[in-house]
């Protein structure tokens, strides 16, 4: 009998309309992986943040049509993966989308999966580099809500997957020019305390960038890894993307910015990178080139499809590993999903 496979794509989510901004913010900051405090304190803080930031966030979303593009981008990726996967397998499968902080939530998706009645589930995060605050939170939430006994295979990350790297290299090469430029590989920031607690995120970001730089094979390439989207007074990963654009401006170096941890266009790319950070470059009259996210890039979709095929064909019914089916993080990273779920 052929397998029936439920594939679940994990992503952050976002407000479908301006009125959903506050509940989205509440869900985000109520997550214990984001604010690790006990209730009722975490609930109170999430309420305060969602109320105080609502108007500012609504104004930001109004710049891109008053909604999150991430939702429709994820739908496009789902369709592209579905079509590609059909070329390789005869098994029956359905791809579901599970957003962490907006609909469709885990309970809703699990209900749909139960109706489908699969023989196994494969979890695929649309976060190439693992963090306990993104993939870790989504996987934990899904497993806490599932109430059926089905084998579950979990892809924790794919920061150095061959075609994932090739997809980035291909897009970057299209935008390169023979000028005095610096590449900034901009990743979403994290508080340093999360990294110090054993989260492998920044390690995996470096691994991704090292592979891309090696494949670009440009002598004396001027590049830096930077971090964006910091919030609040606590210490975050450095250097900050906006500070590095400022520095490049003072040096009269043109900027090529690569959103290295994002695979979908959303508020952090369309507003923060395209509008806010570009203003810094404009102030110094330097050229500012923003590389698109991978989206439905054919090489990237091939990469995700190949990862899924590897896990579909793996006989380990409860596999939790990187895309290469082995652990890639040093043991000091205790928050690695391989530690948390095995």
From Swiss-Prot:
GO cellular component, one term: cytoplasm
Listed EC numbers: 4.98.1.1
Pfam families found in the cross-reference section: Ferrochelatase
GO BP term, example: heme biosynthetic process
Biological role: Catalyzes the ferrous insertion into protoporphyrin IX.
SUPFAM superfamilies in the cross-refs: Chelatase
InterPro entries: Ferrochelatase, Ferrochelatase_AS, Ferrochelatase_C, Ferrochelatase_N
Pathway: Porphyrin-containing compound metabolism; protoheme biosynthesis; protoheme from protoporphyrin-IX: step 1/1
Amino acids binding Fe cation: 188, 268
Coiled coil: none
Broad class of enzyme this protein falls into: lyase
Family the UniProt entry places it in: Belongs to the ferrochelatase family.
Domain of life, per lineage: Bacteria
Primary location: cytoplasm
Protein name: Ferrochelatase
Keywords carried by this UniProt record: Cytoplasm, Heme biosynthesis, Iron, Lyase, Metal-binding, Porphyrin biosynthesis
